């Protein structure tokens, strides 16, 4: 038998992994037993008689114990220099030579004995250093704290009442492929409420409902049912409303087969194209006498009202930029929980580009100087956000302040809307009873069938939406009472004591105590009075409108000069309180009822601003607020007690100085976070006090508000303290009734959200309004402190998408370290060992650099963006809407700590993910070994000659054909994400096989190859979430029998490098070491990948696939450097070293 040389090329680092023989386990046990006993003198004599050698004969084992020679970058084998006895050792198993170079440490020789060379230490992929373990535990601890805080702290209460309906749907089958190519995939329906709508004829105003991501067309039923019932029970009996142009609403809804629009830009465009054709068809129905039942004197409809939920709101805005959009067919858009500001995820390039096209179009349209140049001049957009309970789409993304001016749209939160006053989750915003009532009534209020557009003019529509959706206390709120005509003639006795002295407060603890109708007259200070006077009134009783006979009415009155024989018949309502006295004064009065602001009732028994199903209905408070300039043309405010029997109820009315009731606390955010903020309301205070804190803008921070108890000297409070926190832009208000403690969170300046068109970020801030009983002569102490644990939960919704990017930052740095150690020492260290080395230097340096980069960009940014958008003035404007897109999405230096925080969390996540991958591969390896069958009659010698099937792969021709077929499918039918998923599965199987061999035969070559394949598998797994959404969309299309070839993602080059690399690894071919300058290319590619993932990964996550794809292309090239650049070399790239295995070793 020929003896083979121990220096065979099979031990090269670039060779295939060593295959374990059948007796490998027996040898390992024997070796372990022998190593457990000390060496005897006889053993030393045997070693001395034997010639020095570091290899063991095949008679004892087939395993080569010699350290493998390294292959340089040119593919030649380098012989290791002889060892030096005095060279110092290295922790990585290296020794220093005389010329200062590091090389692998070999066994030293002594003159007395020759010790056999030891096997390089086995590097377990499960092992983790103490420092890496601590970092991982800290990171996972932070992540658990964030998740725990998000579900336990700073939670908004749920206050939605259940809604009920009796739905039916009529499918419009005539809207078929003759109208649109997408009719075979999508369907159009007309909603009808049972027992109310008697047929399917259209006779009202068209409204189109667009469902959101994976939404159902049946989601229209709560709002459509409320609209049908409200018209049937109320409006059709209101003659004034019918004369004003109100008609019932015809709700159309679209069945998108629960399409996934959030993950696929082409699907979004397809839906917009289909809906434009649907709008054209809907408008044509009103021209067909067979299906329309309308007054022939009314104009035919030329536009529809659009109601969109979630991504349906984005589809609605997309319709206006599509080529098939019919001009002026949409002029009113109401969206609910729609992410207008940015895509919810950035995994698809077409989605990101579509968002950019939509938002650029809208901004460009509203920046035009003249209305005729603005194609969206008549369009109004109202975005309604659910608030903190919406955990599907961050409500920060619902902001349209960066898209439309306040003359054409606004953003409002459901907690702001009167009589709603609660946050809502992503689905509850559709069925919440009190909310759907407001939406239905608001739509009816903008309808006017006397116009072809079926709606009122734009300015009037905006006025209506602000009335229904805003509190009425905003600075833009318009007061209707001063502009109205006098409705009431009030006659009072000149000798009456009902006139309140100027400067005094009117306080009524009960109504009707006088036993007769009584008017309390409060003189109005003249305009321009010092202190900027304002009038405020609060009561728990509903204020009457003109002509109503309730308990209380508030009027603004002017004295009518007395003229003989003057007729008073022009007043619809007259109240004579003079009791027949000759000395009387007549007042012409306007009702304040149109300007009443509803506030949640705050008593000692209330807990929330709302009431739930089964609870007693709570009557809200009525509040009036006017500046003196608004009512300066009147002389008196008349508070009329119309009830004549003692009735529970209070009234507090006063004129107060604006300077006394409003204050601004200029405190830095750092001081507020460190020391908190304290202030007090004095005993002699107005009923309403307001405190503005401009530094409270960030949506990442949460606070706790505490209010001390007030002493009323034995009397009961008229009402419990009521607190309102609000932002001026967007319109977000939250109410706290019976307030003693309150949790404060807001949706202000948020990460990755573009700045508003006005750019007035520094002027805005969080404000607090306090309604307190002014009759209690005691001060109130208020304290605002930061809630750091509650603030952690706010990071979840704002930064959950970083897990699509930042882990790649960690993985790329670890891979870079693994390749650098491998090119230097020939050892491809395990992933966790590479992570430990990175934690000692690379990761801290990178985080420090990224922090300084963020700080420098924030300093260099123009101060508050000096050039803003100016409307209709012709000035050029520059606004950077992308400066929040990078890194952590904010340039505020206060939040720079988030960079290392996110990084340490990702270190923990990557560590856990690595152990999960190790567990998966080991389990699969165990399963594979269980199904492997070795016949018992095969002898040991035959087992030695048998090459295991671990890396027996199909022939090169078959693999090339398989790859070609897969790429052909990508080109024609399937998206490249499908091929990438296949590549991940193949890489998993390769890693499992490499793990089996490395565990059965512990050698450097096997360990290197396993660690290499495992790290590539980890990299591919972190890229997989970016590709899975598009794959899910493709599978969904197949599930709904939409067999049209996928319309995007067919670029073969986007996946070919991954396929080639994975196929190369299936041959067991280890990547060669790069001894020349080419090794720096790998390092630079991985370094660039890490930087790109950290800086651009969140906003442009889809590009990470392309970056990793380029890395795979480079690694495939490096694999091929062991051969010449020829067709034979390309074949060898696929075939590995199968030929070597067939030829065996050469002597």
Swiss-Prot record:
**Xref: Gene3D superfamilies:** alpha/beta hydrolase
Spans annotated as Disordered: 1-94
Q: Which InterPro entries match?
A: AB_hydrolase_fold, PGAP1-ab_dom-like, PGAP1/BST1, PGAP1_TMD
Task: Identify one Gene Ontology CC term for this UniProt entry.
Answer: endoplasmic reticulum membrane
PROSITE patterns, per the entry: LIPASE_SER
Location of this chain's protein in the cell: Endoplasmic reticulum membrane
What ranges does the record list as Basic and acidic residues composition bias?
28-49
Q: Which Gene Ontology terms cover its molecular function? A: phosphatidylinositol deacylase activity
Low complexity bias: where?
A: 50-63
Source organism (scientific name):
Chaetomium globosum (strain ATCC 6205 / CBS 148.51 / DSM 1962 / NBRC 6347 / NRRL 1970) (Soil fungus)
A biological process (GO) of this protein is: GPI anchor metabolic process
Query: What exactly does this protein do?
Result: Involved in inositol deacylation of GPI-anchored proteins which plays important roles in the quality control and ER-associated degradation of GPI-anchored proteins.
The protein's Enzyme Commission number: 3.1.-.-
Q: Which family does it belong to?
A: Belongs to the GPI inositol-deacylase family.
Record-annotated membrane-spanning stretches: 127-147, 795-815, 843-863, 893-913, 918-938, 965-985, 1015-1035, 1052-1072, 1084-1104
- What membrane topology term does the record carry? Multi-pass membrane protein
Q: Tell me which residues this entry annotates as catalytic.
A: 310
Q: What is this protein called?
A: GPI inositol-deacylase
Q: Does the keyword Transmembrane apply?
A: yes
Locate the coiled-coil region(s) and give their ranges: none
According to the record, which residues are glycosylated? 23, 74, 865, 873, 1011
**Sorted alphabetically, which keywords does the UniProt record give?**
Endoplasmic reticulum, Glycoprotein, Hydrolase, Membrane, Protein transport, Transmembrane, Transmembrane helix, Transport
